[in-house]
Regions:
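PRPP-associated nucleotide enzymes
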Residues: 1-298
Length: 298
């Protein structure tokens, strides 16, 4: 809000004794352009329900337009039916946001870009790349090389390599279950390189740590991971504590680090970059009906 020179709207959120959520927007929103900021993380079910109720309250308060700002779009990994009798929860979340009364969605680095097609309202999809690339350029690495920790992230990794003017390598992996990952080969030469692994998110750090170990075995000089979202779990912290391959983990503040996890005692350097100005500029442009996509022309 400091970037926009505006104040945060006043809203009261409380719980009834039975656990139900009650929301009251204190400020008058009639005829206003309302932006509701709420990442669906940490306690995704609670956060999602809060968001839906806030949107409904703004709609019933006669807001002119309601934009749901989701720095982190929870449930994004459930984006397709890959087994019998499973839901496509990412689509369900989209339906709920629209049904509640959202006129527009602003989010960042979706796990699957096709989620934008789940909506029948405009979706502005931001990327953390400008923030990450600025930081990485300032490091002046001797022999940088961008690496995708899996084949699915190759497109995003290629974009980073173009922005940084580096080569590209890919780690091919075989997933065993939902959290266990067996990285088995590297496509490209990483020997002597300052590796930058690019990923949209990590929770248990299985892919990240397995890929880092393999890259170190292949002769990488240093290994950094640039990850937009980090809804870290206990398992993720355990893996990072045991890891001896990663030099630095660079993340953004789209997801707050859990206070109950000892993230300040990790052997790997943890750097948190702010995307507040990027989100603020996108909000300003949406409010003024200006282009958002021009933020990402390099």
């Amino acid at each position: 809000m400091a970037y926009l020179g505006s104040r945060l709207g006043d809203i009261n959120i409380r719980r009834f004794p039975d656990g139900e959520i009650h929301v009251k927007i204190v400020d008058n929103v009639r005829g206003r352009d309302v932006f509701i900021v709420q990442p669906i993380c940490t306690q995704p079910n609670e956060m999602l329900m809060e968001l839906l109720i806030m949107i409904d309250a703004a709609r019933r308060g006669s807001a002119a337009r309601i934009t749901a700002v989701l720095p982190y779009y929870g449930y994004a990994r459930q984006d397709r039916k890959d087994q019998p009798r499973v839901p496509i929860t990412a689509k369900l979340v989209a339906n709920l946001l629209v049904a509640a009364g959202a006129n527009r969605v602003l989010t960042m680095d979706l796990h699957a870009q096709q989620i934008q097609g789940f909506f029948d309202i405009p979706v502005d999809h931001l990327h953390a790349a400008p923030v990450m690339v600025k930081y990485l350029r300032e490091m002046e690495l001797k022999k940088p090389l961008v690496v995708s920790p899996d084949t699915g992230g190759a497109k995003a990794a290629y974009a980073y390599s173009q922005m940084l003017g580096t080569g590209l390598a890919i780690v091919a992996k075989q997933r065993m279950g939902d959290a266990e990952v067996d990285a088995f080969s590297v496509v490209g030469d990483v020997e002597g390189c300052d590796v930058i692994m690019v990923d949209d998110m990590t929770t248990t750090c299985g892919t990240l740590c397995a890929a880092a170990k393999l890259l170190k075995e292949k002769g990488a000089s240093s290994i950094r991971a640039a990850v937009t979202h980090i809804p870290l779990t206990e398992k993720g912290v355990e893996r990072l504590q045991a890891d001896t391959s990663l030099t630095e983990l660079v993340v953004t503040d789209t997801v707050p680090l859990r206070a109950d996890l000892p993230t300040n005692k990790l052997p790997v350097k943890l750097t948190v970059l702010s995307v507040a100005e990027l989100l603020g500029e996108a909000i300003r442009r949406i409010h003024q009906d200006q282009s958002v996509s021009s933020l990402f022309r390099y």
